[in-house]
Amino acid sequence: MGLMALVMSMLLILGACGKTGLGNNSGNAGKEVTKKSAKDLKLGVSISTTNNPYFVAMKEGIDKFAGKKAISLKVADAQDDAARQADDIQNFISQNVDAILINPVDSKAVVTSIKAANNANIPVILIDRGSEGGQVLTTVASDNVEAGKMAADYIVKELGEKAKAFELSGVPGASATVDRGKGFEKVAKEKLDLLSSQSANFDRAKALNTAQNMIQGKKDVQVIFAQNDEMALGAAQAVKSAGLKNVLIVGIDGQPDAHDAIKKGDMTATIAQQPAKMGEIAIQAAIDHYQGKKVSKKTLSPIYLVTKDNVDKYNW
């Protein structure tokens, strides 16, 4: 190596060693982070919808914890519209927020927005649902595969093998839909008679109509598994309207209406999540990142099987 090349190499090494900042956190390769206190942070939050008690609870958890930490917060409701969510995220990027918290409408569609944030060196934190690409600081979610499996195992335990079952799935393309279906169907295809699986978009009214149509031709159904409580509540209405007895209704989320339905006997069980806690964990991840603390690539929030026997124990 020539003398000049050697000198230049040494200068580059010394320059790299002398850099200030907090270095790289997972999902933010290449970005030097300036240390900030919580009260100096400006965060953008994109919620998939506020027309669902689960995501309302998540938003409330975010609002409450951010308020406690004196964080400046901008929240946008995507109204279950992936294009609208993309616009909201672009607005956050234009406003140069310190981090963007995203609860994706669609795990594939959101990738473009995540990459745009990556290009702007803005950390991205995902809540409840993952993405199919882009770099994220962390994903805060329940183990949705395990939630689906837990529901299926409970059904097999209650009804035995080969029980006739319907499945109501969520928004096509959402990671929660894919993962809950994967967990449920892994058990169901071996141990249940899965008569039909149809999407109702995580929506109560759509689930009511879909379940009514499913029931018409197959009134010997023994259980309806819904990938969230809103759909489970719609299915419960359909079962009641059809005059069917002893049909198990199992959901996921643990929302207050589901707890009431379990107490009344309209629903059988739910796999409870902690949406408000997820929101709190996501905010804390942003704080930790700007304090130079290591942020785990994924943070799992606990889930619980809730039945009439323990319905008063688990609340949001």
Give residue spans per PLM region.
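Sec-dependent N-terminal signal peptides of Gram-positive bacterial secreted proteins and lipoproteins
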Residues: 1-22
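A residue-level marker of the well-folded mature domains of exported/periplasmic proteins
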Residues: 16-316
